[in-house]
Amino acid sequence: MASTSMSLTRACKVHAVLACSIPSVSSAFLTTNVTFLGQPVEMPSQRWSQRRCSRPGPVTVRAEEVKEVTQAKGLSRESGGQWLSCTTRHVRIYAGYVDPETQVMDQSQLDKLTLMLDPDNEFEWPEEMVEKVYDKYRELVETYAGADLTEYTLRLIGSDLEHYIRKLLLAGELKYNLDCRVLNFSMGKPRIDPADLDDVEVEE
């Protein structure tokens, strides 16, 4: 298991990025900037989406400029050559920067955490639901501020975020995507209130 001596700090700055790397799959990326070796590092981000966003996005970066920095540097294990990650069914967290267009990881930007949300597109993700998950992610990063940046720490964050997604589903705020390539209802079958159905009598 690879690890680095980097720590999460409370002075982290979060940038949200939406990406549609494959026409049939809509993924969400969230890159978190933290201080590295005591120096704050900022990275402007860009918002991509198949549908028009209602709110203005963050600072725009030209695609060719992003691709120039998104390259593997061949660093050693001591320098982070073995990328840290957390992978669950709907949450993937990487220590590094992932280009939302090419999905290539920049191995030199080890001061960032990148969140990939629901890569299989199992749920429908309206803008407000994406923001809710982002807010929870920011909260979890702040909660674990100061902890060593290890795969164990990333798994704690990823597991908590996975439980939060399940909570949204059970509360009826999040819905399954019925156009998903595979419908296996990984978090339980949909629950329907009979009172919401037409021509159905509900006994008191």
Swiss-Prot record:
InterPro entries: NdhM. One of its GO terms (molecular function) is oxidoreductase activity, acting on NAD(P)H, quinone or similar compound as acceptor. It is a peripheral membrane protein. It is an enzyme of class 7 (translocase). Belongs to the NDH complex subunit M family. NDH shuttles electrons from NAD(P)H:plastoquinone, via FMN and iron-sulfur (Fe-S) centers, to quinones in the photosynthetic chain and possibly in a chloroplast respiratory chain. The immediate electron acceptor for the enzyme in this species is believed to be plastoquinone. Couples the redox reaction to proton translocation, and thus conserves the redox energy in a proton gradient. This is NAD(P)H-quinone oxidoreductase subunit M, chloroplastic. It comes from Physcomitrium patens.
